[in-house]
């Protein structure tokens, strides 16, 4: 672990060094560019200095010339003033002298006029040069002020960056010193490990020699004594039934019972928390009995009302898991199939938490925006919103690890056996994180409730609801702490119990092999139980062989008799059909005979021959006795019942009902009743067919609706997958854009440093030049 931490710190130092190196390259480039710009600005400043000096020299020469001209004008004016009285005195002299003085005066006037014009021109040039110099000086001063402000800003930025980089450099140097110390200690440990490895190698050689001797002895014993060896394939070894460890199973059932009790307490606390939160929304910040609450809180209350359908399955899933752990099973991750159900219920609850989290945050924001919310209450609400986010994140983390633990019972390659211990350790860490988050929620909510109780508008209902929520949060905190401590206390046992299985430590290969092993274990237990039963009295072997021959012969004769009985039944059914046929024929023939006798009797009555009548009666009696069978002769006074394939006919003898029409009426009534019965059966069958047809149509409609819903769900799933891919693309693009912006910001910072250094140098040069100019002006 120390080497891994050291390697991670080395990697972090290398990354920081690479970042600083890249920034150093950028800064070097910026410094070079800044130096080039400063050199160019220096050249420009020199050129401007030279032009300024030329202008100053011209101005000095002009002022000197102006002074000379002024002195010359004064001298000329003095000479003129002296010459005027002399001219008056000498006016009387000759005209030659006056003409001479007039010419000299004109020359002097012309010279004076030229000097005056030149002086005026020089004054104008001097004024323009002075104005231009003042304008340039004002412009340079304003630019100097702006540059000084910008330089101060850039200097502040540079100071902050230098401070930051110095801190990072000091931190890296300290880390480097620590890592050097650690590397020295690790080198010492490595030397000690080398010495230990040498000692272990010596011990290994001795053990290898000892074990090789034992192996040869064992191989010789196995080759001589063991007829077959089935330990070649690990897939088959996983099917071997392990030794039954009743203590282990009782311990696992006890642990599962404790976990079930903790989960039940946690489920009760979660139900109370969500229910009381729903009640609080109805009364604060707006009481629903007085005024309507916001649509957001209405939707949030509706979602919170459904919390039982998401929280209760957690208890049911844990109960099923507890019931699946019995004394007769082998409890490892590959056989705990019910853990997958608990993981699915936990996933559905986390989806519920994700669904209500935005509404919860918006509800807290709405409380902050209300007029009753103070600054302290607003701070507590912000802390609670952060705690709710952490709570959802902790539940998601816990569900991820539990889903990983449920993989070995469903997917063979979902989780490697070597990662079981790390996943269990992470589950314990997640439970401790859940406990910490619940402690923060309890602390912040108690502060929030205390602040709300001090409000002048706090009602008794709000105070009671806050107390209930606080008690449920405290119960959640206690339950989370109990579960975390329980899991931490049993973590070593969980990790150690993973080796419980076939061949002690080889483990199961797949859930199917674990299931087969459990079936083999049940069969082995049933076999061992059957061995405990006392043996029943058995038949001797010779007698059993004799009885077997008799049994075979009796079974053969039985099969033959069964065939004969079947043939006899078929013959009887055929004879019954023929009997019915001939009975109907006899009845029809009898009816025809009676009609014929009646016709003959009518004829005899008409002819009035008594002899013929007697003869006809004798013939009728003879024909009646010949046409009747033994059954009709015995049943003279009883009604005769005729059974056919189409129904049953009941008739009386000739002595009771001699009338032919009554007999025909009986047959007619019988067939009419049979027709009525068949029509009723037909109507019943029609009604059933209509009912079945309606049910089939309803089922077909439901099937069509189900197909449509299936298609809609597939479309939604496709859209969801597309949205997921789109969001992933957006995430990558935003990540890249942020990285580009960071690089651009670093480049911009370097360019700002360059401009800052340039402006600083320019300011220094301008200050120097302004100081030189001021000194020159003072000297002048």
Swiss-Prot record:
Residues 1-207, 556-607, 693-742 form a coiled coil. One of its GO terms (cellular component) is membrane. It is found in: Early endosome. Residues 84-104, 760-780 are annotated as: Disordered. It holds the Pfam family KLRAQ. GO terms for molecular function: RNA binding. Keywords: Coiled coil, Disease variant, Endosome, Intellectual disability, Phosphoprotein, RNA-binding. Residues 95-104 have a biased composition (Low complexity). Signal peptide: none annotated. InterPro entries: PPP1R21 (IPR040024), PPP1R21_C (IPR049372), PPP1R21_N (IPR019343), PPP1R21_six_helix (IPR019348). The modification Phosphothreonine is found at residue 652. Component of the FERRY complex (Five-subunit Endosomal Rab5 and RNA/ribosome intermediary). The FERRY complex directly interacts with mRNAs and RAB5A, and functions as a RAB5A effector involved in the localization and the distribution of specific mRNAs most likely by mediating their endosomal transport. The complex recruits mRNAs and ribosomes to early endosomes through direct mRNA-interaction. In the complex, PPP1R21 serves as a binding hub connecting all five complex subunits and mediating the binding to mRNA and early endosomes via RAB5A. Component of the FERRY complex, composed of five subunits: TBCK, PPP1R21, FERRY3, CRYZL1 and GATAD1, with a ratio of 1:2:1:2:4 respectively. PPP1R21 serves as a binding hub connecting all five complex subunits to mediate the binding to specific mitochondrial mRNAs. Interacts with the GTP-bound form of RAB5A (via its C-terminal region); linking the mRNP complex onto trafficking endosomes for active mRNA transport. Interacts with PPP1CA. Coiled-coil domains of PPP1R21 are essential for RNA binding. It is linked to Neurodevelopmental disorder with hypotonia, facial dysmorphism, and brain abnormalities: An autosomal recessive disorder characterized by global developmental delay, severely impaired intellectual development, hypotonia, coarse facial features, and muscle weakness, often resulting in the inability to walk or sit. Additional features include feeding difficulties, respiratory distress, scoliosis, poor visual function, and rotary nystagmus. This is Protein phosphatase 1 regulatory subunit 21. It comes from Homo sapiens. The lineage of its organism: Eukaryota, Metazoa, Chordata, Craniata, Vertebrata.
């Amino acid at each position: 672990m120390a080497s891994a931490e050291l390697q991670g710190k080395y990697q972090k130092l290398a990354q920081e060094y690479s970042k600083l190196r890249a920034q150093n390259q950028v800064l070097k480039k910026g410094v070079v560019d800044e130096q080039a710009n400063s050199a160019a600005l220096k050249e420009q400043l020199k050129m401007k200095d030279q032009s300024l000096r030329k202008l100053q020299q011209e101005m000095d020469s002009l002022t000197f010339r102006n002074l000379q001209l002024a002195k010359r004008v004064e001298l000329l004016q003095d000479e003129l003033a002296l010459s005027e009285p002399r001219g008056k005195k000498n006016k009387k002299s000759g005209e030659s002298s006056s003409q001479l003085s007039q010419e000299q005066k004109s020359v002097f006037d012309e010279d004076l006029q030229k000097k005056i014009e030149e002086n005026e021109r020089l004054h104008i040039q001097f004024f323009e040069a002075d104005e231009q110099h003042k304008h340039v000086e004002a412009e340079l001063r304003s630019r100097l002020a702006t540059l000084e402000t910008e330089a101060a800003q850039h200097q502040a930025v540079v100071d902050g960056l230098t401070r930051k980089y110095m801190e990072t450099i000091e931190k890296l140097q300290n880390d480097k010193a620590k890592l050097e110390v650690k590397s020295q200690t690790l080198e010492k440990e490595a030397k000690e490990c080398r010495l230990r490895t040498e000692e272990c190698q010596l011990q290994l050689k001795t053990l290898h020699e000892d074990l090789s001797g034992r192996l040869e002895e064992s191989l010789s014993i196995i080759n001589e004594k063991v007829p077959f060896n089935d330990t070649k394939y690990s897939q088959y070894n996983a099917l071997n039934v392990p030794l039954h460890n009743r203590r282990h199973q009782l311990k696992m059932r006890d642990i599962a019972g404790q976990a079930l009790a903790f989960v039940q307490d946690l489920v009760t606390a979660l139900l109370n928390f969500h229910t009381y939160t729903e009640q609080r929304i109805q009364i604060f910040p707006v009481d629903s009995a007085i005024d309507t609450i916001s649509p957001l809180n209405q939707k949030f209350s509706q979602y919170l009302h459904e919390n039982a359908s998401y929280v209760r399955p957690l208890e049911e899933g844990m109960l099923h898991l507890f019931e699946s752990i019995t004394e007769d099973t082998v409890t490892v991750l590959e056989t705990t199939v019910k853990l997958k159900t608990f993981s699915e219920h936990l996933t559905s609850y986390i989806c519920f938490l994700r669904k209500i989290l935005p509404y919860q945050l918006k509800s807290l924001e709405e409380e902050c925006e209300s007029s009753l919310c103070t600054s302290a209450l607003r701070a507590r609400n912000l802390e609670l919103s952060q705690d709710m986010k952490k709570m959802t994140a902790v539940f998601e983390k816990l569900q991820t690890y539990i889903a990983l633990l449920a993989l070995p019972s469903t997917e063979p390659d979902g989780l490697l056996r070597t990662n079981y211990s790390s996943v269990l350790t992470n589950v314990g860490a997640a439970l401790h994180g859940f406990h910490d988050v619940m402690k923060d929620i309890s602390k912040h909510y108690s502060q929030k409730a205390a602040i709300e109780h001090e409000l002048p508008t706090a009602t008794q209902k709000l105070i009671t609801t806050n107390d209930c929520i606080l008690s449920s949060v405290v119960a959640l905190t206690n339950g989370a702490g109990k579960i975390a401590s329980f899991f931490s206390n049993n973590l070593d046992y969980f990790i150690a119990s993973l080796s419980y299985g076939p061949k002690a430590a080889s483990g199961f290969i797949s859930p199917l092999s674990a299931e087969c092993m459990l079936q083999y274990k049940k069969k082995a237990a049933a076999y061992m139980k059957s061995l405990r039963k006392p043996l029943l009295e058995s038949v001797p072997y010779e007698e059993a062989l004799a009885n077997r021959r008799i049994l075979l012969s009796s079974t053969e004769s039985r099969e033959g008799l069964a065939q004969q009985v079947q043939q006899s039944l078929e013959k009887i059914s055929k004879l019954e059909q023929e009997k019915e046929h001939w009975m109907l024929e006899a009845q029809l023939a009898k009816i025809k005979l009676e009609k014929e006798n009646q016709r003959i009797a009518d004829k005899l009555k008409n002819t009035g021959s008594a002899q013929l009548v007697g003869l006809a009666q004798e013939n009728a009696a003879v024909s009646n006795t010949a046409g009747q069978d033994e059954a009709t002769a015995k049943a003279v006074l009883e009604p005769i019942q005729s059974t056919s394939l189409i129904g049953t006919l009941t008739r009386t003898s000739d002595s009771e009902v001699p009338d032919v029409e009554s007999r025909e009426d009986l047959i007619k009534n019988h067939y009419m009743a049979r027709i009525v019965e068949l029509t009723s059966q037909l109507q019943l069958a029609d009604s059933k067919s209509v009912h079945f047809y309606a049910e089939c149509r309803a089922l077909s409609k439901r099937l069509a609706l189900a197909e449509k819903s299936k298609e809609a769900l597939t479309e939604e799933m496709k859209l969801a997958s597309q949205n997921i891919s789109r969001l992933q693309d957006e995430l990558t693009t935003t990540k890249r854009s942020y990285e580009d912006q960071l690089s651009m910001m670093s480049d911009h910072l370097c360019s700002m440093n360059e401009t800052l250094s340039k402006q600083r140098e320019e300011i220094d040069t301008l200050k120097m030049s302004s100081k030189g100019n001021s000194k020159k002006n003072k000297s002048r």
